[in-house]
Amino acid sequence: MENYIKIKDKFIIADPKDNVATARVEVKADTVLMTDDGSKIIIKELIPFGHKVALKDENRDEGVIKYGQRIGIATKDIAVGELVHVKNLSGERGMAK
């Protein structure tokens, strides 16, 4: 049996609509997390403290949601458990809609 860690022990999920979570602590690759609905997320790469992880697969040009608000768009496909940062996210702050 695998050892699971509750996702809320390692990450902050601010709103049920969020498709990213923020790391409370540094989280190593291959960490297995259990979500509230019983599904598991395997962390794909090191997630530094304060950085975001994808809670579901995101397609290129799809909105990234944090605090229940769209904070940017995916610039390439993002897999669940992957770091969400400038390498795959474009912020929309200050951009005309």
Ranges and model annotations:
Residues 1-66, 70-97:
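Well-ordered secondary-structure scaffolds
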